[in-house]
A protein has these predicted regions:
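Conserved phosphate-binding catalytic cores of ATP/NTP-utilizing and phosphoryl-transfer enzymes
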Residues: 1, 110-138
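Glycine-rich phosphate-binding loop plus the immediately following alpha-helix
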Residues: 154-199, 231-232, 236-240
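Short glycine-rich phosphate-binding loop at a beta-alpha junction
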Residues: 71-81, 278-289, 310-313
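Short Gly/Thr/Asp-enriched flexible loops that form oxyanion-binding sites at enzyme active sites
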Residues: 79-105, 122-123, 293-302
Length: 359
């Protein structure tokens, strides 16, 4: 039995979790900073780092307490080292390194992006294991505030980026729309809640890079995303309706429902076009935006019968440390540890090797 402490601090959640053998989540603690960043309509990196510094110790202590263990019971400590906000990452990494030294534990650096994919496999009730050959090749759709990317994972342990956003990520599109309409932060959950009262076909928003407007899509952009035009279209619509402060409730709800519909439509169209093109056996939907009920419902509706579809549980879609500690079990098994020179990186190539090979 291997108990791994996972630590996550890549953005605005300070999280720690204890995971047993990559599957059983023994404890999972998350300290959110939403209230701190909400007045600014987005995450302020320096503020995030200060909040992490205050929260990291108590959060780790609580994770150990909830698990009913001491550091002596752990097999390793894992920490997100990239990608993310460097000031925020450094807090989690510095703490993890100190914890590893003090308790004579190996250190494992985790790619936050791969961690999100593993969110669909952590938990004893997860229907598949990450290294199940029946799933490969796999298409992972990582949809969050920082990413909107399609990655093909192959049986030889490689991952290949086949699509990404050219401008705003889907989560940013939600946040910026909420800011435009003075709805609050984070925008995704607020828009989802209000959009339930509106008509999805009340307004037509552009579906960029899909060919929906009769414009041919360049081959290199077939699986890429662009949401900046969608945001601009909303800006013009609101202006034409008299401004955000002049919208009736019905107008607001219709705008949001139609806007959300455009995002969901583009995401699902690209996901399943890529799944067909690359002849994958499974598709994984993960990342913070995967909490969106409309997206989850449409994703499940459009899954072809020949595909295995996995959607990460909502509690493992947003940033958490269970996905970090769970994924780390594969590195622990192979002894793939990191030294204390492990560095924080704002960006990391999304085409990277997995911690296992099925060949």
């Amino acid at each position: 039995m291997a108990l791994i402490l996972g630590i996550e601090s890549s953005c605005d959640e300070t999280a720690a979790a204890v995971v047993e053998d990559g599957r059983r989540v023994v404890s999972n603690v998350v300290a959110s900073q939403i209230a701190k960043h909400s007045p600014y309509g987005g995450v302020i990196p320096e503020l995030a780092a200060r909040e992490h510094l205050t929260a990291i110790g108590p959060v780790v202590d609580q994770a150990l307490k909830d698990a009913g263990i001491t550091p002596a019971d752990l097999s390793a400590v894992a920490v997100t080292h990239a990608p993310g906000l460097v000031p925020a990452l450094l807090i989690g990494m510095t703490y993890a390194k100190g914890f590893a030294i003090a308790n004579d534990l190996p250190l494992i650096g985790i790619n936050h992006f791969l961690g999100h994919i593993y969110g669909a496999f952590v938990g004893e009730d997860a229907p598949y294991k990450f290294d199940d050959p029946a799933l490969y090749p796999m298409l992972a759709a990582v949809v969050s505030g920082g990413h909107t990317s399609l990655v093909v994972l192959t049986p030889d342990g490689k991952s290949h980026l086949v699509g990404t956003t050219l401008d705003d990520a889907a989560g940013e599109a939600f946040d910026k729309a909420a800011k435009l309409l003075d709805l609050g932060y984070p925008g995704g959950p607020i828009i989802e809640r209000l959009a339930k009262n509106g008509k999805t076909d009340a307004h037509h928003f552009p579906r960029s890079l899909t060919g929906a407007a009769g414009k041919p899509v360049a081959p290199e952009n077939r699986f890429n995303f662009s949401f900046s035009g969608l945001k601009t279209s909303l800006l013009y619509l609101v202006r034409d309706l008299g401004g955000a402060d002049k919208l009736s409730e019905e107008q607001l709800y219709d705008c949001l429902a139609s806007y959300q519909e455009a995002i969901v439509d583009v995401l699902c169209t690209k996901i399943f076009d890529a799944a067909k093109q690359y002849r994958v056996k499974s598709v994984v939907l993960c990342g913070g935006v995967a909490c969106n009920g409309a997206l989850r419902e449409r994703f499940e509706q459009r899954v072809p019968k020949n595909l295995i579809a996995l959607t990460a549980p909502k509690k493992y879609c947003t940033d958490n440390a269970a996905m970090i500690g769970g994924l780390a079990s594969f590195y622990h098994r192979s002894g793939a540890y990191n030294g204390l020179d492990l560095d924080a990186q704002a960006r990391l190539p999304l085409s990277t090797e997995l911690p296992f090979s099925l060949r």
